[in-house]
A protein has these predicted regions:
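Secretory targeting signals
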Residues: 1-6
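Short, surface-exposed acidic
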Residues: 163-168, 265-278, 317-325
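Pocket-lining segment of extracytoplasmic ligand-binding domains
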Residues: 98-99, 173-267
Length: 336
Protein backbone atom coordinates (compact mmCIF):
# COMPACT_ATOMS: atom_id res chain seq x y z
CA UNK A 1 0.00 0.00 0.00
CA UNK A 2 1.45 3.34 -1.00
CA UNK A 3 0.01 6.09 1.16
CA UNK A 4 1.40 9.59 0.57
CA UNK A 5 2.48 11.47 3.61
CA UNK A 6 0.04 14.31 4.42
CA UNK A 7 0.93 17.90 3.77
CA UNK A 8 1.72 18.75 7.37
CA UNK A 9 5.38 18.49 8.23
CA UNK A 10 7.29 20.74 10.49
CA UNK A 11 10.86 21.18 9.25
CA UNK A 12 12.76 23.94 11.03
CA UNK A 13 16.27 23.58 9.66
CA UNK A 14 19.47 23.66 11.67
CA UNK A 15 20.89 26.98 12.77
CA UNK A 16 24.20 26.37 11.04
CA UNK A 17 26.51 29.35 10.89
CA UNK A 18 23.84 31.88 10.04
CA UNK A 19 24.62 34.13 12.99
CA UNK A 20 27.79 35.19 11.23
CA UNK A 21 25.75 36.93 8.55
CA UNK A 22 23.14 38.54 10.78
CA UNK A 23 21.84 41.77 9.28
CA UNK A 24 19.55 44.62 10.24
CA UNK A 25 15.91 43.53 10.43
CA UNK A 26 13.64 44.63 7.64
CA UNK A 27 11.44 46.77 9.89
CA UNK A 28 14.21 49.38 10.02
CA UNK A 29 13.92 49.84 6.28
CA UNK A 30 10.28 50.06 5.24
CA UNK A 31 7.03 51.89 5.97
CA UNK A 32 4.43 51.78 3.23
CA UNK A 33 2.53 54.65 1.64
CA UNK A 34 -0.43 54.21 4.01
CA UNK A 35 1.84 54.67 7.01
CA UNK A 36 1.71 50.99 7.94
CA UNK A 37 4.87 49.35 9.22
CA UNK A 38 5.92 46.60 6.81
CA UNK A 39 6.85 43.35 8.52
CA UNK A 40 7.58 39.80 7.41
CA UNK A 41 7.03 36.50 9.18
CA UNK A 42 8.88 33.38 8.06
CA UNK A 43 6.89 30.19 8.60
CA UNK A 44 8.46 26.81 9.16
CA UNK A 45 6.30 24.98 6.65
CA UNK A 46 3.88 25.46 3.78
CA UNK A 47 0.63 27.33 4.42
CA UNK A 48 -1.66 25.28 6.66
CA UNK A 49 -4.24 25.54 9.42
CA UNK A 50 -1.47 25.48 12.02
CA UNK A 51 -0.66 29.03 10.87
CA UNK A 52 -4.32 30.01 10.82
CA UNK A 53 -4.08 32.81 13.35
CA UNK A 54 -1.52 34.63 11.21
CA UNK A 55 -3.57 34.28 8.06
CA UNK A 56 -6.76 35.29 9.86
CA UNK A 57 -5.13 38.45 11.22
CA UNK A 58 -4.01 39.25 7.68
CA UNK A 59 -7.26 38.36 5.91
CA UNK A 60 -9.61 40.14 8.31
CA UNK A 61 -7.56 43.33 8.61
CA UNK A 62 -6.47 42.83 12.22
CA UNK A 63 -2.85 43.55 11.37
CA UNK A 64 -3.83 46.71 9.50
CA UNK A 65 -5.92 47.83 12.48
CA UNK A 66 -2.72 47.64 14.51
CA UNK A 67 -0.76 49.68 11.95
CA UNK A 68 1.01 46.70 10.38
CA UNK A 69 1.44 45.53 6.81
CA UNK A 70 2.47 41.89 7.31
CA UNK A 71 3.84 39.49 4.71
CA UNK A 72 3.54 35.80 5.65
CA UNK A 73 6.24 33.75 3.95
CA UNK A 74 5.68 30.00 3.66
CA UNK A 75 8.47 27.62 4.55
CA UNK A 76 9.11 24.14 3.21
CA UNK A 77 11.59 21.27 3.14
CA UNK A 78 14.26 23.37 1.41
CA UNK A 79 13.78 26.49 3.54
CA UNK A 80 16.29 27.09 6.33
CA UNK A 81 14.12 29.26 8.53
CA UNK A 82 16.69 30.24 11.11
CA UNK A 83 19.37 30.99 8.53
CA UNK A 84 17.02 33.34 6.71
CA UNK A 85 15.98 34.99 9.94
CA UNK A 86 19.50 35.42 11.29
CA UNK A 87 20.55 36.88 7.94
CA UNK A 88 17.97 39.64 8.43
CA UNK A 89 15.63 38.37 5.73
CA UNK A 90 12.57 38.42 7.99
CA UNK A 91 11.46 40.37 11.04
CA UNK A 92 9.85 37.42 12.78
CA UNK A 93 10.15 33.66 12.37
CA UNK A 94 8.65 30.43 13.63
CA UNK A 95 10.54 28.36 16.21
CA UNK A 96 10.01 26.29 19.36
CA UNK A 97 11.44 25.88 22.86
CA UNK A 98 14.48 24.00 21.58
CA UNK A 99 15.36 27.01 19.42
CA UNK A 100 15.04 29.25 22.45
CA UNK A 101 17.52 27.06 24.31
CA UNK A 102 19.88 27.23 21.32
CA UNK A 103 19.63 31.02 21.17
CA UNK A 104 20.79 31.19 24.78
CA UNK A 105 23.48 28.50 24.46
CA UNK A 106 25.01 29.90 21.29
CA UNK A 107 24.43 33.58 22.11
CA UNK A 108 22.55 34.09 18.86
CA UNK A 109 20.80 37.39 18.04
CA UNK A 110 17.30 35.97 18.45
CA UNK A 111 14.71 35.97 21.21
CA UNK A 112 11.34 34.23 21.63
CA UNK A 113 8.49 36.67 22.31
CA UNK A 114 5.31 34.55 22.20
CA UNK A 115 4.20 30.91 21.95
CA UNK A 116 1.02 30.39 19.98
CA UNK A 117 0.99 26.61 20.43
CA UNK A 118 0.87 25.89 24.14
CA UNK A 119 0.93 22.19 23.30
CA UNK A 120 3.41 20.60 20.94
CA UNK A 121 1.13 18.73 18.49
CA UNK A 122 3.55 15.79 18.27
CA UNK A 123 1.88 12.42 18.80
CA UNK A 124 2.48 8.73 18.57
CA UNK A 125 -0.28 6.77 16.85
CA UNK A 126 -1.18 3.13 17.46
CA UNK A 127 -3.73 0.69 16.10
CA UNK A 128 -6.85 0.17 18.20
CA UNK A 129 -7.68 -3.15 19.81
CA UNK A 130 -4.13 -4.50 20.12
CA UNK A 131 -3.28 -3.39 23.66
CA UNK A 132 -1.49 -0.18 22.71
CA UNK A 133 -3.92 2.18 24.41
CA UNK A 134 -1.33 4.13 26.42
CA UNK A 135 2.24 5.32 26.02
CA UNK A 136 3.24 3.01 28.85
CA UNK A 137 1.97 0.05 26.81
CA UNK A 138 4.32 0.87 23.92
CA UNK A 139 7.44 -0.07 25.88
CA UNK A 140 9.34 -2.74 23.96
CA UNK A 141 7.17 -2.44 20.84
CA UNK A 142 8.20 -1.18 17.37
CA UNK A 143 8.00 2.58 16.80
CA UNK A 144 8.56 4.61 13.63
CA UNK A 145 10.58 7.69 14.63
CA UNK A 146 12.41 10.12 12.33
CA UNK A 147 16.06 10.97 12.84
CA UNK A 148 15.32 14.47 14.17
CA UNK A 149 12.92 13.14 16.77
CA UNK A 150 15.54 10.76 18.11
CA UNK A 151 17.49 13.75 19.41
CA UNK A 152 14.55 15.36 21.21
CA UNK A 153 11.32 13.67 22.25
CA UNK A 154 12.72 10.14 21.85
CA UNK A 155 15.27 10.83 24.59
CA UNK A 156 12.43 12.03 26.79
CA UNK A 157 10.36 8.91 26.03
CA UNK A 158 13.30 6.73 27.03
CA UNK A 159 13.67 8.55 30.34
CA UNK A 160 9.94 8.87 31.05
CA UNK A 161 8.68 5.46 29.93
CA UNK A 162 11.74 3.24 29.70
CA UNK A 163 11.70 2.93 25.92
CA UNK A 164 14.85 1.53 24.31
CA UNK A 165 16.60 2.09 21.00
CA UNK A 166 15.85 -1.51 20.03
CA UNK A 167 12.25 -0.39 19.46
CA UNK A 168 13.20 2.15 16.80
CA UNK A 169 12.25 1.64 13.18
CA UNK A 170 12.99 3.99 10.28
CA UNK A 171 10.36 6.64 9.62
CA UNK A 172 10.02 7.12 5.86
CA UNK A 173 7.49 9.99 5.76
CA UNK A 174 4.80 7.53 4.72
CA UNK A 175 2.01 5.96 6.77
CA UNK A 176 2.20 2.74 4.75
CA UNK A 177 4.41 0.79 7.21
CA UNK A 178 2.03 1.73 10.02
CA UNK A 179 -1.11 0.84 8.10
CA UNK A 180 0.04 -2.65 7.15
CA UNK A 181 1.31 -3.74 10.60
CA UNK A 182 -1.01 -3.47 13.60
CA UNK A 183 1.86 -3.92 16.05
CA UNK A 184 3.69 -0.84 14.78
CA UNK A 185 3.15 2.66 16.19
CA UNK A 186 4.29 5.81 14.40
CA UNK A 187 5.15 9.41 15.06
CA UNK A 188 2.86 12.09 13.69
CA UNK A 189 1.23 15.44 14.30
CA UNK A 190 -2.12 15.81 15.99
CA UNK A 191 -3.39 18.03 13.20
CA UNK A 192 -2.69 15.74 10.25
CA UNK A 193 -1.62 12.10 10.61
CA UNK A 194 -4.74 10.92 12.50
CA UNK A 195 -6.81 12.44 9.70
CA UNK A 196 -4.78 10.59 7.06
CA UNK A 197 -5.00 7.32 8.99
CA UNK A 198 -8.78 7.56 9.21
CA UNK A 199 -9.00 8.29 5.50
CA UNK A 200 -7.04 5.06 4.99
CA UNK A 201 -9.43 3.06 7.18
CA UNK A 202 -7.67 3.07 10.58
CA UNK A 203 -9.14 4.96 13.55
CA UNK A 204 -5.92 5.35 15.54
CA UNK A 205 -5.22 5.55 19.23
CA UNK A 206 -3.63 8.98 19.64
CA UNK A 207 -0.95 9.50 22.28
CA UNK A 208 -0.41 13.26 22.74
CA UNK A 209 3.12 13.68 24.09
CA UNK A 210 2.31 17.07 25.63
CA UNK A 211 -0.37 15.48 27.79
CA UNK A 212 2.33 13.31 29.37
CA UNK A 213 4.72 16.15 30.13
CA UNK A 214 6.53 16.96 26.89
CA UNK A 215 6.14 20.70 27.47
CA UNK A 216 7.76 22.06 24.32
CA UNK A 217 6.26 25.35 23.12
CA UNK A 218 5.54 25.33 19.38
CA UNK A 219 4.66 28.08 16.92
CA UNK A 220 6.99 30.28 18.93
CA UNK A 221 7.49 33.75 17.47
CA UNK A 222 11.10 34.91 17.48
CA UNK A 223 12.52 38.29 16.63
CA UNK A 224 15.84 40.08 17.07
CA UNK A 225 17.06 41.65 20.32
CA UNK A 226 17.49 44.84 18.26
CA UNK A 227 13.76 44.84 17.45
CA UNK A 228 12.87 44.24 21.10
CA UNK A 229 15.21 47.00 22.24
CA UNK A 230 14.47 49.67 19.62
CA UNK A 231 10.88 48.95 18.52
CA UNK A 232 9.11 47.19 21.40
CA UNK A 233 5.81 48.79 20.43
CA UNK A 234 6.00 47.10 17.01
CA UNK A 235 6.69 43.73 18.60
CA UNK A 236 3.75 44.24 20.96
CA UNK A 237 1.43 45.14 18.10
CA UNK A 238 2.44 42.06 16.14
CA UNK A 239 2.01 39.72 19.12
CA UNK A 240 -1.30 41.26 20.15
CA UNK A 241 -2.71 41.24 16.61
CA UNK A 242 -1.63 37.64 16.04
CA UNK A 243 -3.28 36.60 19.31
CA UNK A 244 -6.50 38.23 18.12
CA UNK A 245 -6.11 36.43 14.81
CA UNK A 246 -5.92 33.09 16.60
CA UNK A 247 -9.00 33.83 18.71
CA UNK A 248 -10.92 34.74 15.56
CA UNK A 249 -9.67 31.72 13.62
CA UNK A 250 -10.63 29.21 16.29
CA UNK A 251 -13.91 30.72 17.46
CA UNK A 252 -15.33 32.83 14.62
CA UNK A 253 -15.45 32.21 10.88
CA UNK A 254 -12.10 30.79 9.67
CA UNK A 255 -13.04 31.15 5.99
CA UNK A 256 -10.97 34.32 5.35
CA UNK A 257 -7.76 32.66 6.56
CA UNK A 258 -8.59 29.37 4.87
CA UNK A 259 -8.94 31.11 1.52
CA UNK A 260 -5.43 32.54 1.86
CA UNK A 261 -4.04 29.20 3.06
CA UNK A 262 -5.50 27.32 0.11
CA UNK A 263 -4.35 29.97 -2.34
CA UNK A 264 -0.79 29.65 -1.02
CA UNK A 265 -0.96 25.85 -0.73
CA UNK A 266 -3.62 24.25 -2.97
CA UNK A 267 -2.73 20.81 -1.57
CA UNK A 268 -4.48 21.76 1.68
CA UNK A 269 -7.98 20.37 1.31
CA UNK A 270 -10.92 21.92 3.12
CA UNK A 271 -11.55 18.68 5.01
CA UNK A 272 -8.00 18.56 6.38
CA UNK A 273 -8.15 22.22 7.40
CA UNK A 274 -11.46 21.63 9.19
CA UNK A 275 -10.01 18.60 10.96
CA UNK A 276 -6.94 20.55 12.07
CA UNK A 277 -9.04 23.40 13.50
CA UNK A 278 -11.17 20.88 15.37
CA UNK A 279 -8.09 19.13 16.76
CA UNK A 280 -6.53 22.39 17.93
CA UNK A 281 -9.72 23.25 19.80
CA UNK A 282 -10.40 19.75 21.15
CA UNK A 283 -6.92 19.20 22.54
CA UNK A 284 -6.21 22.74 23.74
CA UNK A 285 -3.25 23.31 21.47
CA UNK A 286 -3.61 27.11 21.44
CA UNK A 287 -5.64 27.88 24.55
CA UNK A 288 -4.83 26.70 28.09
CA UNK A 289 -5.03 27.98 31.66
CA UNK A 290 -1.95 30.09 30.98
CA UNK A 291 -3.58 31.83 28.01
CA UNK A 292 -6.77 32.38 30.00
CA UNK A 293 -4.74 34.07 32.73
CA UNK A 294 -3.02 36.47 30.32
CA UNK A 295 -3.42 36.11 26.56
CA UNK A 296 -3.12 33.72 23.64
CA UNK A 297 0.61 33.32 23.06
CA UNK A 298 1.40 33.23 26.78
CA UNK A 299 4.70 31.96 28.13
CA UNK A 300 5.91 31.51 31.71
CA UNK A 301 9.31 31.22 33.35
CA UNK A 302 8.12 28.07 35.13
CA UNK A 303 7.21 26.37 31.88
CA UNK A 304 10.48 27.27 30.15
CA UNK A 305 12.59 26.16 33.12
CA UNK A 306 10.57 23.01 33.75
CA UNK A 307 10.93 21.82 30.17
CA UNK A 308 14.61 22.72 30.07
CA UNK A 309 15.26 20.75 33.27
CA UNK A 310 13.34 17.80 31.84
CA UNK A 311 15.42 17.85 28.67
CA UNK A 312 18.66 18.10 30.64
CA UNK A 313 17.62 15.04 32.64
CA UNK A 314 16.84 13.23 29.38
CA UNK A 315 20.24 14.09 27.92
CA UNK A 316 18.71 16.26 25.21
CA UNK A 317 20.15 19.54 26.50
CA UNK A 318 23.43 20.50 28.20
CA UNK A 319 23.20 21.73 31.77
CA UNK A 320 24.13 25.24 32.83
CA UNK A 321 22.39 27.32 30.14
CA UNK A 322 20.95 30.68 31.19
CA UNK A 323 17.77 30.05 29.23
CA UNK A 324 16.21 33.42 30.02
CA UNK A 325 18.61 34.89 27.47
CA UNK A 326 16.62 33.07 24.79
CA UNK A 327 13.16 34.46 25.51
CA UNK A 328 11.27 37.36 27.07
CA UNK A 329 7.84 37.58 28.70
CA UNK A 330 7.67 41.31 27.99
CA UNK A 331 5.00 41.02 25.30
CA UNK A 332 2.70 38.28 26.64
CA UNK A 333 1.68 39.60 30.03
CA UNK A 334 -1.37 41.55 28.91
CA UNK A 335 -4.79 40.41 27.66
CA UNK A 336 -5.04 40.72 23.88
Amino acid sequence: MNVPHPTRRRALATLGGAAAIAAAPAFLRTVNAQGLVKLSYQCGWLAQAEQGGLYQALATGIYREHGLDVEIRPGGPQVNVMQLFLAGQSDFAEADSFRGFAFAQEKLPAVAVAAFFQKDPRVLMSHPGVGNDSLEALKGKPLLVATAGRQTYWLWLKTRFGFTDEQLRAYTFSLAPFLVDKQVSTQGFLTSEPFAARKAGVDPVIHVLADKGFDNYQNVVVTSPKMVREKPEIVQKFVTATAKGWASYLHADPAPANALIRAANPAMGEDLIAYAIGAMNKYGVVETADTQATMIGAMTHQRWKGFYDTMVAAGAQPAGTEIRNGYTLQFVGKPA
